[in-house]
Amino acid sequence: MGLKPPLKTRNPRNPAVAGVGLRPQPLLIDSIPCHRGVAGVDEVGRGCLFGPVFAGAVVLEAANASRLQQEGLTDSKRLSARRRGDLVPLIEHEAEAWGLGQSSTREIDRLGIRPATELAMLRALQRLPNRPELVLVDGNLPLRPWTGEQRSIVAGDQHSLAIAAASVIAKQCRDALMQRLSQRFPGYGLERHAGYGTALHRAALLDLGPSALHRRSFLRRFLG
């Protein structure tokens, strides 16, 4: 069975990119078709003080996306850890394809957070068995390393089921890594905040200093 034609959009290298950064209509989650040629991509951990940034990429067909929506799939930030854990195997089963990518703390400090996040997204997309015809990117900025067709969607994880699925998989995997790393780097409370800059985390940094996996480029203003 052949692929359905992708949504019409312009190449992101064109200054007059159609759809990039535009706020979607309320029912966009229903108006963007899910099929083999469309992948949703999202990142997790961009604003953390510790650890890598993760990205997920998911390709969903319409019927499978509808089943996941009935199971409560939405933006990962709106879901409890238990609910995300329940959804991950369902997403893996229903997705036409999915992939994960990450950029290390060293890459974040060397490249900067935006290029490192884009690299994680690119790696997630490269893990898909087939190159998608269209990539839906969460946010208002284009994915610069991606040379194919793409569309940036503000609050995309609330409006595209493929992006929502990507955010759930990425967050669940990153949080699981933070749980393991909390044993290697005790005292920072990583098991509680997953590396975000909470009051507990900042107090621990002042007391213990940064670990090998803290983002030095994020801590300069905080620690001096």
Swiss-Prot record:
EC nos: 3.1.26.4
Which cystines does this chain contain? none
Give the main EC class. hydrolase
* Residues where a divalent metal cation binds: 42-43, 138
One Pfam family assigned to this protein is: RNase_HII
Q: Which PANTHER family match?
A: RIBONUCLEASE H2 SUBUNIT A, RIBONUCLEASE HII
Q: What does this protein do?
A: Endonuclease that specifically degrades the RNA of RNA-DNA hybrids.
Name of the featured protein: Ribonuclease HII
Q: Which organism is it from?
A: Parasynechococcus marenigrum (strain WH8102)
**Mind giving the lineage of the organism this protein is from?**
Bacteria, Bacillati, Cyanobacteriota, Cyanophyceae, Synechococcales
